[in-house]
A protein has these predicted regions:
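N-terminal signal peptide c-region/cleavage motif recognized by signal peptidases
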Residues: 14-16
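Conserved, mostly hydrophobic/aromatic
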Residues: 71, 96, 118, 150, ...
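Active-site-proximal loop/turn and secondary-structure-junction residues that shape catalytic pockets
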Residues: 97-99, 120-121, 141-143, 161-163, ...
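Short acidic, glycine/serine/threonine-rich loops at helix termini
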Residues: 103-104, 127-128, 147-152, 168-171, ...
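Active-site loop/helix belt of alpha/beta enzymes
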Residues: 188-336, 424-426, 435
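Charged (often Lys/Glu-rich) extended helix/loop segments that serve as interaction or gating elements
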Residues: 303-306, 310-463
Length: 463
């Protein structure tokens, strides 16, 4: 065990220092330690391989694995950075990142509220014990049933347009209630992230624009509606944001709106939600802004804006990926290895139906071959979906893999299972949660009969 403890210390050292220190081989490891070791590029060590093989044998592949300790640690890190600097603080979890009820329950137990984007996510939040008033409902296209449900529950409706405001007013009048609302604001800020998840730019479909006073006029209109209770302002400029500049500019603009609403309309907001979007490292050696970096950058802007407004709303934050992304591992098994005149394909038993991000966003995920360290070769990790674009990782130098080997894809805890599908009539993967050296199924594997669960039984045709 002393050797194991030394190895774990080395896992936490800086990459530069680790390069100078001989790293003892991990001959045994708990499941949690094996997950950490895979992140530290130690997936070839015998103890790590034993742990992953145990998971594959017990639960099958493809398999989503989540590290409970990582999720808790991320919440603690964000709270430790912001709580000392912002006395009025509320943190929510963006449920769309990972909708598994056990994951959500873990975050609820850490004191987080729920940010949802659909009726299904509303019902998921209720299922794990959230009360309606603890929920913020954000969507750019809410249907009448969703608006009705949110008002019934007393959730905060994050209104995206004047058209929606009218619908919310009408439904609140029908229910003889006051609808709790904030407006989603488009601040016109480019956070320099992937285009498909860049939501703060002017051409985005999200929010009421600050420019030309559009957002201000929405508050002015809502103030005259007795069915509406204005509670806050919201913005979310994008996801996988790696620098503080976009947040600082957004905060400055949003606090300017807070000041204008107070001075010109006598509207005092209970909260200002700056959204989520904190990025995580998807590549080895990648250095991003930390929660501490972001909190330090926002603190002076917040204090200045609050002083100018003459009061302090509660700061709301709503990360998703930051909490769960790094906790997730997609464990797959190699079906075949195929060499062509141009490439070598390692074909695994998962595809973009299992992990959509590489195909949809050209997203990069680190890949490890379990239990292998020798004979590296340049390969593409190809999925089992019948599409040319089903490549999970392209042009990676990895130890030589063979049929039956295990390959793990890292940082798959956010927008992994939650974006998965049954395309190509392949059942959904299982999900397990690791706590120390224990694992438990938190979603069982889909079955072939379930592929037909909502269809009418067809009568066989005779020829």
């Amino acid at each position: 065990m002393p050797l194991l403890r030394l190895s774990l210390v080395l896992l936490l050292l800086s990459p530069a220092l680790c390069a100078q220190v001989a790293k003892p081989t991990l001959h045994e490891a708990t499941l949690h330690e094996a997950l950490l070791a895979a992140h530290a590029d130690r997936a070839g060590d015998p103890g790590v391989a034993t742990a992953f093989r145990h998971l594959a044998k017990t639960y099958g592949t493809p398999l989503y694995i989540y590290d409970q300790a990582h999720i808790r640690g991320q919440v603690d890190a964000l709270h430790a950075a912001f709580a000392p600097r912002f006395s009025k603080l509320r943190i929510l979890y963006a449920i769309k990142a990972n909708t598994n009820p056990v994951v959500i329950s873990l975050l609820k137990a850490k004191g987080l509220g729920a940010e949802v984007v659909s009726r299904g996510e509303i019902e998921t939040a209720l299922r794990v014990g959230y009360a309606g008033p603890e929920i913020m409902f954000t969507s750019s296209s809410k249907n009448p049933g969703e608006i009705q449900r949110a008002i019934e529950l007393g959730a905060v409706l994050n209104v995206d347009s004047l058209d929606e405001l009218g619908q919310v007013q009408a439904e609140a009048r029908r229910q003889k209630k006051q609808a709790r609302i904030s407006f989603r604001i488009n601040p016109g800020v480019d956070p320099h992230t992937i285009h498909q998840i860049n939501t703060g730019i002017a051409e985005s479909k999200f929010g009421l624009h600050l420019q030309d006073g559009i957002a201000f006029k929405a508050y002015e209109k809502a103030k005259g509606m007795p069915e509406i209770r204005i509670e806050g302002a919201h913005c979310h400029i994008g996801s996988q944001i790696t620098e503080t500049d976009g947040y600082v500019l957004t905060a400055r603009k949003m606090l300017g709106l807070v000041k204008d609403l107070k001075e010109k309309l006598n509207i005092k907001l209970a909260f200002l939600d700056l959204g989520g979007g904190l990025g995580i490292p998807y590549e080895d050696g990648q250095t991003l802004m930390s929660p501490e970096d972001l909190a330090k950058a926002l603190e002076p802007v917040w204090k200045e804006g609050v002083a100018a407004a003459g009061y302090e709303p509660t700061l709301w934050l709503e990360p998703g990926r930051f909490f769960v992304g790094g906790s997730g591992y997609l464990l797959t098994r190699v079906n075949t290895v195929k060499q062509t005149p141009l490439k070598t394909f390692v074909n695994v038993d998962a595809g973009f139906n299992t992990l959509m991000r590489p195909a949809m966003y050209k997203a990069y995920h680190r890949v490890r071959v379990i239990g292998k360290t020798k004979d590296p070769q340049l390969v593409d990790i190809a999925g089992d979906v019948c599409e040319t674009g089903d490549i999970l990782a392209e042009a990676r130098m990895l130890p030589r893999a063979e049929a039956g080997d295990l390959v793990v894809i890292l940082d798959a805890g956010a927008y992994g299972f939650s974006m998965a599908s049954e395309y190509n009539a392949r059942p959904m993967p299982a999900e397990v949660m690791v706590d120390g050296n224990k694992a438990r199924v938190i979603r069982r594997r889909g079955t072939y009969p379930e592929l037909f669960r909502n269809t009418e039984r067809a009568t066989p045709t005779k020829h």
